[in-house]
A protein has these predicted regions:
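Periplasmic/cell-envelope proteins involved in peptidoglycan metabolism and beta-lactam response
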Residues: 1-189, 207-208, 213-215, 293-301, ...
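Beta-lactam-recognizing serine transpeptidase/beta-lactamase-like catalytic domain environment
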Residues: 168-218, 223-455, 462
C-alpha cells in the first residue's frame, strides 16, 4: 500500500512539475505572442480602448482618439480623411493598422521602450496609458493643393525639401475615408473594406510609395544624363545621333522619337537639346554605348533597388538586370520593365538639386509624450552621394533649359529659375499614357523638389497637365 501511495505521489509530483514547467514556458517565452494574438479579447480592448496619441500637421490634429460609449472606450477619428489617408493609414479593430498608424504604433499607443517611465508615472498617478503624439513634416497648404490637383483623376504628387529630406506633401488619388475602417461596428467595417478592396482603382494604395509602381518614362533620362557625364565619354558639347527611328538590335522593332515634337528637326543633338525636347533615340544610343552595367549602377546610386523607410515602407524601384540590347534601349527611356514610385522620381530631382547628395526622405518631425517631453526629433540625414557636384550642376543646367526652352515650359514660374523634366510612359495598348513631371525650384537655391504623375492620360494633354501642376506647386511654396 505504502509503495502504491508513494507511486501515486510521485506521479502527481511529476504532473505538477510538468504543468509548472509548461506554464513557466508560456509565461516567459510565449507571453508576447499570446498578448498580440488577434483573438486575445483582453489585449484587443486594451490596445483599442486606450487613448491613442494624435497625428499632427502644422499644430492641428488630423488623427485623434475621442471618448466613446462602448467597450473600446475610445474612437479613432480622422479629420480631412481623404486628403491624408495615404499618410495616416487607418487604425481598425478588424483589419489592424496601416500608414503612420502602423509604422509608429508603439509610440502612438504608449507602449514603446522609450515610454517606459511615462507608463510607470501614469500607473502611480492612477491615469490610464496615453500615447505619444506624432508631428509630421507635411505642410497642410501644400498637401491641400496637391490633393486638389489630383481630384477626379488617378495619380500621385510628392513634394520634398531637397536640402533636408522633409516630405512637404504626399497625395494619392483616388483616396478613401479611414473613419469607416476605424468604426466599432464590425459588420459595417467589413462591408466598407470589402468594397475598397474590390474597387479596380485601388484607393487603399498610397500610390506615392506603394502598390503598383510606374514606368518613369522620360524622367529616367535624368539618370541617363548623369551616367553619360560620369563615364567621361560625353560632355556638354557631345553630339549624338538622333534618328527619327532607332532599329532595336536583334529585333524587327524600332524605337521612335515623338513625331510631332522638335526632335524631328535634327538628325544629331547635344544631350542638353535632346533632354529639353525629350528625344528618345539619343538616350538609347548613349545607353547602348555605355552598357547595362553603367546605367544600372547609376540608377542604384539614385535609389533604384534600395530599401527605404520614411518611416512608411516604400516599395523598391527597379531597374531590370540581364537585358538584351533591345531591352536596354527601351529601359533607357523609362520603358520596358523599369518600375518606380513618385517618391523615387522626386528623390532623383532632389539629389540633382542638392549637388548630387541625396537626403533621406522623412515624414516625421517629432514624437512627443502626453506631458510634452520629446521622444524623438527629426534631423536631416544624408542617405547617399548619387553623383558629384560637378555632374549635378551640369544636369541641373540642362533641366533648367528644359523649362526655359523645352517641352517642360509649362512649369515655368515668372522671375524664378525652374529646373524640370517631363515624362510620358506608355501603358499597354490602350493609347493612354502616364504623364510625369519632376523638377525643383528655385534652381539656384532649391526649396522644393517634386514629382507629379497622372495615370491614363492622352498624350496630347499629358505634359500640359503635369507641368501645370508643377507650376502651381512651385508658386505655392515660393509665394508667387
Amino acid at each position: 500500500v505504502d509503495r502504491a501511495i508513494r507511486r501515486m505521489w510521485m506521479s502527481a509530483a511529476c504532473v505538477f512539475i510538468l504543468l509548472m514547467g509548461t506554464l513557466s514556458y508560456i509565461q516567459f517565452f510565449d507571453a508576447q505572442m499570446l498578448m498580440e494574438h488577434k483573438w486575445n479579447t483582453r489585449a484587443l480592448y486594451d490596445n483599442y480602448g486606450s487613448q491613442r496619441g494624435s497625428i499632427v500637421v502644422n499644430g492641428t490634429e488630423i488623427a485623434s482618439s475621442v471618448k466613446s460609449n462602448d467597450e473600446y472606450n475610445y474612437q479613432r477619428v480622422y479629420s480631412e480623411p481623404e486628403k491624408y489617408a495615404g499618410i495616416t493609414g487607418y487604425f481598425s479593430s478588424v483589419y489592424g493598422s496601416t500608414g503612420i498608424e502602423s509604422a509608429l504604433d508603439k509610440e502612438l499607443s504608449g507602449t514603446s521602450d522609450s515610454q517606459f517611465y511615462d507608463r510607470v508615472a501614469q500607473l502611480f498617478s492612477g491615469n490610464s496609458t496615453r500615447g505619444a503624439s506624432v508631428e509630421l513634416t507635411v505642410d497642410d497648404k501644400l498637401q491641400t493643393l496637391a490633393y486638389q490637383l489630383l481630384q477626379g483623376r488617378k495619380g500621385s504628387i510628392v513634394a520634398m525639401n531637397p536640402k533636408t529630406g522633409e516630405i512637404l506633401a504626399m497625395a494619392s488619388s483616388p483616396s478613401y475615408d479611414p473613419n469607416k475602417l476605424a468604426a466599432h461596428n464590425e459588420q459595417s467595417v467589413i462591408a466598407d473594406y470589402t468594397k475598397l478592396t474590390q474597387d479596380q482603382q485601388s484607393p487603399l494604395f498610397n500610390r506615392a510609395i506603394a502598390g503598383n509602381t510606374y514606368s518613369p518614362g522620360s524622367t529616367f533620362k535624368i539618370i541617363d544624363a548623369v551616367a553619360a557625364l560620369e563615364s567621361g565619354k560625353y560632355d556638354e558639347k557631345s553630339v549624338i545621333d538622333n534618328p527619327a527611328q532607332l532599329p532595336l538590335p536583334g529585333t524587327n522593332v524600332t524605337l521612335p522619337n515623338f513625331v510631332n515634337g522638335q526632335c524631328a528637326t535634327r538628325t544629331q543633338a547635344t544631350i542638353e537639346w535632346a533632354l529639353a525636347q525629350s528625344c528618345n533615340t539619343p538616350f538609347a544610343n548613349i545607353a547602348l554605348d555605355l552598357g547595362q552595367e553603367k546605367i544600372s549602377q547609376t540608377a542604384s546610386k539614385f535609389g533604384y533597388g534600395q530599401d527605404l523607410s520614411i518611416p512608411l515602407k516604400v516599395t523598391k524601384s527597379d531597374f531590370p538586370s540581364d537585358m538584351t540590347k533591345s531591352q536596354l534601349a527601351q529601359a533607357s527611356v523609362g520603358q520596358y520593365d523599369v518600375k518606380t514610385t513618385p517618391l523615387q522620381v522626386a528623390m532623383t530631382s532632389a539629389a540633382i538639386a542638392n549637388g548630387g547628395v541625396q537626403m533621406k526622405p522623412n515624414l516625421v518631425r517629432s514624437v512627443k509624450t502626453s506631458n510634452l517631453s520629446t521622444l524623438s526629433e527629426f534631423s536631416p540625414e544624408k542617405l547617399r552621394t548619387s553623383t558629384s557636384q560637378k555632374v549635378a550642376d551640369q544636369v541641373k543646367q540642362w533641366m533648367v533649359n528644359s523649362v526655359d526652352n523645352g517641352i517642360a515650359s509649362g512649369a515655368g514660374v515668372s522671375g524664378v529659375k525652374v529646373a524640370g523634366k517631363t515624362g510620358t510612359a506608355e501603358i499597354g495598348t490602350t493609347g493612354l499614357n502616364n504623364s510625369w513631371f519632376t523638377g525643383f525650384a528655385p534652381a539656384d537655391d532649391p526649396k522644393i523638389a517634386i514629382a507629379v504623375v497622372y495615370e491614363d492620360i492622352d498624350v496630347s494633354t499629358g505634359a500640359k497637365l503635369s507641368t501645370n501642376a508643377g507650376k502651381q506647386l512651385f508658386e505655392a511654396v515660393l509665394n508667387k
